[in-house]
Amino acid sequence: MRKVLVLMMALIMFVNMFGLKVIMVTDAGGLGDKSFNDGTWAGVQMAVEQLPDIEAEILISKEQTDYVPNLTNAAQNGDVVIGVGFMMADVLFNIAMQYPDTFFIGIDIEPSPNQVIPSNLALYTFKEEEGGFLLGYLAASMTKTNKVGFIGGLEIPPVKRYEIGYRSGVEAFNQIKGENVTVITGYVGSFTDSSKTKQIALSHYDHGADIIFTGVTTAAVIDAAKEVGSSFYGLPDNAPLNQIIEEYFEKGRGYFVIGYDMDQDYIAPGYVLTSSRKKVDVAAFEGIRSALYDRNFNSGHHVLGIEDEGMGISPMKYTKGMVPNEVIAELVFLQKLMKDGEVDIPQNEAELGSFDVNSINIPF
């Protein structure tokens, strides 16, 4: 046994002598998106800081035509290649098969039905519907107009799961509380068209929604929320948080946006109610760790949700004082039910149509 342990330690030391060069290829949003590109890069930086002998580089994709040259460049010059975003799925699969001696990690990338995943490719996706469910329940609990909004970029699976989950949360609230909160939905057709995103957000607010969950450029929806909200409160755009909170309680209502994929509450304190949290940083770190230490790469499709803390919502650092304690307690209770497998969140329209939570008894 001692000889085996010595051999294992020697192997790890041998591997660490050479380390790994990790090259991340962004989606078209690039760094600074305050979303999954930034989150994945944070996971890479965490690996650089916490794991031995990791060198990191990043290649920025400005548009989808950059995927092939960037991923090819990364495969030729790196030991581990991380591709970010659903839109580069086909390219990542093709490049991974061309470079079998390189490890590939796909973040927010899932295989097609019956698609064989190469042994050098690890895919990480998330149960966005679970985070969306909690956000929908919170929005329905907080709305003063009985209307909430959802804005997506492109109708791709991760965004649709967010939408379905969000609407499921609203439906759960309606069934449990006997209310009739409705959801206004809209899609931009792009993840980068800030002007159209803001236009849709203003339209949602104009049609009565007072809370919007955005699965697209959050900054544009925040601009809309601040524009409408500051006018309603009679405050300047740069009003401090304490004044926003005072006016919220004075007026008895306000205008909010819900961020996505990362904790975006800090971007506009008092206007960002909360954010979904997709642990893309953890996925990137675990993929790199697997390549470094195991050399038995943990390939395949890994789906992370609330049960394994891959999804969640932000702690509402700036707005928790606006949210009744009863609502906070209900969110914690519902999250526990999901962790325990006692409630399954719909992933598509058919499942949403038959969604029934009347059996859920909130014990307070």
Enumerate the predicted regions with their spans:
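Sec-dependent N-terminal signal peptides
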Residues: V4-M13, M17
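A residue-level marker of the well-folded mature domains of exported/periplasmic proteins
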Residues: L20-F364
